[in-house]
Structures are given as C-alpha cells and as structure tokens.
A protein has these predicted regions:
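N-terminal glycine-rich dinucleotide-binding loop that anchors FAD/FMN and/or NAD(P) in oxidoreductases
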Residues: 43-62
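Short amphipathic alpha-helix with an adjacent loop that forms part of the alpha/beta core around
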Residues: 67-70
Length: 184
C-alpha cells in the first residue's frame, strides 16, 4: 500500500519519514519547489532532532511538488498543511480547502473511489464534515487525525504518542491504526 502526504513541512516530513521507516512506500509533496529539490538531494535545512538520520536511512520515500500524482498513486493521503490561528481563535483552513479542491478536480477525470484523505492538521469543529460532503461524489473517505506534538521533539512525540485520535469510519480505518502502531 502506498501512503501519500501533502504538506511536507516540519511535521509532515517527520511523519512521512516515520511511516516510511515502518515499511510503507511514501510519496510526499509540498508546494515549495526549492525545498523539494533539496529533499530529493538529501539536503535538509531543519534542526529538528532525528530527522537527518531518518532521511539518510530512508529507502522508500519520494518527494514531489505534484499533488495530483500523490492523489492518483496513493490509497491513503495525509494532509499536514499549515492551518494558522486567526484573531477570533478559529483556524484558517484554506490550505486544507485547496487539497480538497485538488481531489475534486482530479475526481472529474479519474475515479477516486476507495481513497482516503486523512486531515492531520488542526481544524475547526465541523470542517471535516464539510470536507466529506465535498468529496462524497468522488467516493473519498475523510478521517480526522490531529497530531499532538511540540516543535523540537516532533519525532519523539510521534513515536511516543500519549494518544492517537482517528475520527471517521471506512475501509482504511484499521490500516490507519496499523500505521500509527508501526511508527511507535
């Protein structure tokens, strides 16, 4: 099974590398072309502990700027894009909206039945239900899986998670649990 990731920032990169270490084939995308080129060359500009070792020992991860490729080639696609806080305390989910729009645009041309989108970034109450409604016609299942981590200990926090929350039901639910037990 191939796992996709859209949003390969600090958290996304750590998560993708741990999923790869657990034995999955991973295709990770980000919209920052220079950043992806650096990752493809093995150049890493982060001080996050343990990431260098994970990147250099990885054998089955590929980096791209092509979200469409991730959506078409992968069965389960995690999105860990930025959702910054707004002044009113809510979250700006426009980056997640963009990912859902990518699914919709591809769904017009290519059947997406059986694929799952796992929203791993912080969202507002009700957002995942909205994303699911937008993806129903494409046959995509939406799960909510927020990460509980701190900058500077992302890898450690993912490996030693106090809890894992997976909201949603569908054919990939059990596989999501396996992924999380695999990275721990």
């Amino acid at each position: 099974m191939k796992i996709g990731l859209i949003g390969t920032g600090r958290l996304g990169l750590c998560f993708a590398l741990l999923v790869e270490r657990a034995g999955y084939s991973v295709l990770a995308s980000d919209n920052r072309e220079d950043y992806i080129k650096d990752l493809q060359k093995g150049v890493l500009g982060t001080t996050e502990p343990n990431v260098h070792d994970l990147l250099y020992s990885s054998k089955n991860i590929e980096f791209t700027t092509d979200n469409e490729r991730v959506i078409k080639e992968c069965d389960i696609i995690f999105t860990l894009v930025a959702t910054p806080s707004l002044e009113d305390g809510s979250y700006d989910v426009s980056n997640v909206d963009d990912v859902v729009s990518d699914f919709n645009q591809i769904g017009w041309r290519t059947p997406l039945n059986g694929k799952s989108l796992v929203v791993g970034c912080t969202t507002n109450p009700g957002d995942c239900e909205t994303f699911q409604r937008r993806l129903n016609d494409d046959g995509v299942e939406v799960y909510y899986n927020p990460e509980f981590i701190a900058q500077g200990s992302i890898v450690k926090d993912l490996i030693n998670a106090d809890m894992v929350l997976i909201g949603g039901e569908g054919k990939h639910r059990d596989e999501l649990v396996k992924i999380y037990y695999g990275i721990q």
